[in-house]
From Swiss-Prot:
UniProt-listed Pfam families: Aconitase
Cofactor: [4Fe-4S] cluster
Catalytic activity: (2R,3S)-3-isopropylmalate = (2S)-2-isopropylmalate
Name of the molecule in the record: 3-isopropylmalate dehydratase large subunit
Record-listed [4Fe-4S] cluster binding positions: 347, 407, 410
Enzyme class name: lyase
EC number of the protein: 4.2.1.33
Classification of source organism: Bacteria, Bacillati, Cyanobacteriota, Cyanophyceae, Synechococcales
Pathway membership: Amino-acid biosynthesis; L-leucine biosynthesis; L-leucine from 3-methyl-2-oxobutanoate: step 2/4
Gene: leuC
Organism in which the protein naturally occurs: Prochlorococcus marinus (strain MIT 9301)
Quaternary structure (record): Heterodimer of LeuC and LeuD.
Family matches, as CDD domains: IPMI
PANTHER family documented for this protein: 3-ISOPROPYLMALATE DEHYDRATASE, HOMOACONITASE, MITOCHONDRIAL-RELATED
C-alpha cells in the first residue's frame, strides 16, 4: 500500500475509526449538495427524525436541472421548480448556506466552491456528484457519493469507505502551444483506460502539472473519475495559496497565516511509496478529440480512429459498439468531421479562463452556417466577470447564444438537449450514449478552444490553425 503520500496523510487525519470488514469511517470536512441528489437524503433524515449534524459544513447551490435560457421563477419545467423549492425548504429548515439563483454566487457546484474559497488543501470533500474529484486540484481528497451516503454525511458528517490505492501520474515536460489541460487528461485516460483507476486515487504530478493554472488543474482532476479513479489530486503550491487568498470564504488575517502554515506542510514526501507510477510525456500530446462512447476513446487531431485489430480484446467490444453508434469507420480521420452543435461550459471547462481562451478564437469571426453554438458560464461570478471583460459580446457578435449559469447540455437534465442524431463538439466530460439529451445524440469531447474552432469552421479543426 501507498505510504506518506498526501492522500495517506489526509486520510489518516480524517479517519474516525476502523470498521468491521476493513473499511474506515472518514470525517467529511465539507459537504456540497445540489437539487438532484439531496431530496431523498433529506427525506430519509425526516423519516428518522434526525437533524443535519454540522450545518456549517454543508453548502448548497442549484445547477443540474436549472434552465439556462430563462431563469425567471416559477420555471416552465414543473419538476425543476419543485426540486429547487424542495432544496430551498430543506436549507431553511436545517440552516444550511444556500447560494440560490440571483445570489451572485450560484452556479455549478464544482465551479462555485473553489471560486468562493470553500475548497481548501487538506480537506475531505464529498458531494452527490461524480465530478467532485475536481476539488482535488487544491490538495484535498474529494469524491462523489450516492444518495444514501449523502444521507449519512448529513446525519453524521462521516461515511464508510475502503482506503484507496494511490497511483502517481507523472507528467513530464510541458504542453505545446494550442494544447490544453483537457487534451492532456483525455490523453491520459486514453493511455491508461477507463477502468484503470478503479480502486485508486490519482496523484497528478510533474513539470507539466506544475505549469498549469489552478483552473487548468481543476480540469485535470475533474476527469479523474472518467479514468475509473475515485478521486484525483495535486499537491498544493504557491499557485494554490494565491488562488484561495481573499476569496469570500477563505481564512482571514491570523487565521490565514495559521492555515497557510498548515497547507504548506501538506504534500507527498519525496520518498513516498506509491502503488503504481505512470509517466506521460506532455510534450507529445496533441489537441485531442473523443470519437466513441467513452472518454477513453480519443485520438489526437492528426490521428485516425483506430482499427479494430489495433485494440485489445476488451476494447474491441466497446469499439464495435462505438463505430455503429457514432457512424464512424475504423481508420477514418477525426479531422474535418462536420458538427451540428457546439457547447462551451460544464464543471470541466466553464470557468473564466476557459471562456477567455474560446473568446480569443472566435473574436471578429462568425459561427458557421447551420451550427447551433452556445456558451454557458459555470457560475454567476464567471458570468459577471465575462461581461465586465466583454466576452459575452464577443460570443454574441460571433453568433453564439449566451446563457445563464448551470450544467446545461453536459447532462441535459434541463431544456438544453441534442435533437435526433446531432453531433456536438462539447467541452464537457462525458460522451456516453444519450448523455446530451437525445437517445441518438452523439458527442465529441474536446477543449473549449477546439469547440470554438469547430463552431467557426463547422467541423472538427486543429485549433493551432487559428493561432
Amino acid at each position: 500500500m501507498s505510504k506518506d503520500t498526501l492522500f495517506d496523510k489526509v486520510w489518516d487525519l480524517h479517519k474516525v475509526s476502523s470498521l468491521p470488514g476493513g473499511s474506515d469511517q472518514i470525517f467529511i470536512g465539507l459537504h456540497l449538495i445540489h437539487e438532484v441528489t439531496s431530496p431523498q437524503a433529506f427525506g430519509a433524515l425526516k423519516d428518522k427524525n434526525l437533524r443535519v449534524k454540522f450545518p456549517s459544513r454543508t453548502v448548497a447551490t442549484v445547477d443540474h436541472i436549472v434552465p439556462t435560457d430563462n431563469q425567471s421563477r416559477p420555471f416552465k419545467d414543473n419538476l425543476a421548480e419543485q426540486m429547487i423549492e424542495t432544496l430551498e425548504k430543506n436549507c431553511i429548515e436545517h440552516k444550511i448556506r444556500f447560494f440560490n439563483i440571483g445570489s451572485g454566487n450560484q452556479g455549478i457546484v464544482h465551479v462555485v466552491a473553489p471560486e468562493l474559497g470553500l475548497t481548501q488543501p487538506g480537506m475531505t470533500i464529498a458531494c452527490g456528484d461524480s465530478h467532485t474529484s475536481t476539488h482535488g486540484a487544491f490538495g484535498s481528497i474529494a469524491f462523489g457519493i450516492g444518495t444514501s451516503q449523502v444521507r449519512d454525511v448529513l446525519a453524521t458528517q462521516t461515511i464508510a469507505m475502503n482506503k484507496l490505492k494511490v497511483r502517481q501520474i507523472w507528467c513530464e515536460n510541458k504542453l505545446s502551444n494550442g494544447v490544453y489541460a483537457k487534451d492532456l487528461v483525455l490523453h491520459i485516460i486514453n493511455k491508461l483506460g477507463v477502468k484503470a483507476g478503479v480502486g485508486f486515487a490519482y496523484e497528478f504530478a510533474g513539470p507539466a502539472i506544475n505549469s498549469l493554472s489552478m483552473e487548468e488543474r481543476m480540469t485535470i482532476c475533474n476527469m479523474s473519475i472518467e479514468g475509473g479513479a475515485r478521486c484525483g489530486y495535486i499537491n498544493p503550491d504557491e499557485k494554490t495559496f494565491s488562488y484561495i487568498k481573499n476569496k469570500l470564504c477563505a481564512p482571514r488575517n491570523e487565521n490565514w497565516d495559521e492555515a497557510l502554515l498548515w497547507w504548506k506542510s501538506l504534500k507527498s514526501d519525496a520518498n513516498s511509496i506509491y502503488d503504481d507510477v505512470t509517466k506521460i510525456d506532455a510534450s507529445k500530446v496533441e489537441p485531442t478529440v473523443t470519437w466513441g462512447i467513452t472518454p477513453g476513446q480519443s485520438v489526437g487531431i492528426n490521428q485516425k480512429i483506430p482499427l479494430l485489430e489495433e485494440l485489445s480484446p476488451d476494447d474491441q467490444f466497446v469499439a464495435k459498439e462505438a463505430y455503429e453508434y457514432m457512424g464512424f469507420k475504423p481508420g477514418q480521420s477525426i479531422k474535418d468531421t462536420p458538427i451540428d452543435v457546439c457547447f462551451i461550459g460544464s464543471c470541466t471547462n466553464g470557468r473564466i479562463s476557459d471562456l477567455r481562451v474560446a473568446a480569443k478564437v472566435v473574436k471578429d469571426k462568425k459561427v458557421s452556417q447551420n451550427i447551433k453554438a452556445f456558451v454557458v458560464p459555470g457560475s454567476e461570478k464567471v458570468a459577471k466577470e465575462a461581461k465586465i471583460e466583454g466576452l459575452d459580446k464577443i460570443f454574441l457578435d460571433a453568433g453564439f447564444q449566451w446563457r445563464e449559469p448551470g450544467c446545461s447540455m453536459c447532462l441535459a437534465m434541463n431544456s438544453d438537449k441534442l435533437i435526433g442524431n446531432q453531433l456536438s463538439a462539447s467541452s464537457s466530460n462525458r460522451n456516453f450514449k444519450g448523455r446530451q439529451g437525445s437517445p441518438n445524440g452523439r458527442t465529441l469531447l474536446m477543449s473549449p478552444a477546439m469547440v470554438a474552432a469547430a463552431a467557426i469552421s463547422g467541423k472538427v479543426t486543429d485549433i493551432r490553425n487559428f493561432m
